[in-house]
Amino acid sequence: MNTIGVLKVSGHELDDPHFLAGLTGVIRTMTQPLVLVHGGGKEISAAVEQAGLPVEFVDGLRVTTPEVMAIMQMVVCGSINKRIVTALVNAGVRALGLSGLDIGLLRCEPYRPNGRDLGRVGVVTEVDGAALRHMLTLGWLPVIAPVALGSADGLSYNVNADMVAESIAGTLGTTELIFVSNVPGVLVDGQVVPRLTPAAVEDYIASGVISGGMIPKVRSALAALRRGATSVRIVNLAGLRDGGTRFVTEEAGS
């Protein structure tokens, strides 16, 4: 099988119908096997607020009570996932909408950063890579919502979509993980940095050049390299084919 592309698209980007149309247009011309992981973002928050529940985040992670989990699952596995699948199928792509619950595709354990209880927030511990590879050999494009099955309690968990993409890319091995963002890559003085090593990433984080929501993305990029992804990039839609910032190991960067 050719190098597998794992695309991660944020929910914020998917709020824009023009973005989804553009993404679909690019995907239909790509010849490599693809897996698409998506987030939920503002659409989840809006539904939570409409239900009269608080919207809380800790270090970028959504505090997920059982009530919030039910809403999150409805939105991200339902309306968002099916909106993406519909657009792709209408463009001639054999897209299959899934979450990590389906066939136990993603299993997880509770995530407790610094001992903080965030509720039903999980960290992926297992990916059914064989099932994903089988789908790809059939010519299908799995579209995966970031909900996983708790290994110990059998409950559904909210999992950060960047972490899901990183785990899938690492499990599949010969993959290129592509974070499709609203920026053309990692910017330094307004210019895209074409290549970054782990050491350079840590220096940029320490100096504040890389900050905010870009930090978890670059950390997921490095984690995917450690787990076996062949290549990791952060791009915008225009640079999806070969643009953006490519993350490389220290050896490759020297």
From Swiss-Prot:
Q: What is the name of this protein?
A: Acetylglutamate kinase
- Which GO cellular component terms are attached? cytoplasm
Question: Where along the sequence do coiled-coil regions lie?
Answer: none
Named in its record, the pathway it takes part in is: Amino-acid biosynthesis; L-arginine biosynthesis; N(2)-acetyl-L-ornithine from L-glutamate: step 2/4
> What is the recorded function of this protein according to its Swiss-Prot or TrEMBL entry?
Catalyzes the ATP-dependent phosphorylation of N-acetyl-L-glutamate.
Q: Give the enzyme class.
A: transferase
Keyword Nucleotide-binding annotated? yes
Its GO biological process annotations read: arginine biosynthetic process via ornithine; L-arginine biosynthetic process
Q: Which family does it belong to?
A: Belongs to the acetylglutamate kinase family. ArgB subfamily.
Q: Name one GO molecular function term.
A: ATP binding
Q: Where is this site: Transition state stabilizer?
A: K8, K217
Give the binding site residues for substrate: G40, G41, R62, N158
| Pfam annotation, one family | AA_kinase
State the superkingdom: Bacteria
Q: Which reaction does it catalyse?
A: N-acetyl-L-glutamate + ATP = N-acetyl-L-glutamyl 5-phosphate + ADP
Report the source organism.
Answer: Chloroflexus aggregans (strain MD-66 / DSM 9485)
* InterPro entries the record matches: AceGlu_kinase-like_sf (IPR036393), AcgluKinase_fam (IPR004662), ArgB (IPR037528), Asp/Glu/Uridylate_kinase (IPR001048)
Q: Is Aminoacyl-tRNA synthetase among this UniProt entry's keywords?
A: no
Q: Give UniProt keywords alphabetically.
A: Amino-acid biosynthesis, Arginine biosynthesis, ATP-binding, Cytoplasm, Kinase, Nucleotide-binding, Transferase
Give the location in the cell.
Answer: Cytoplasm
Record EC number: 2.7.2.8
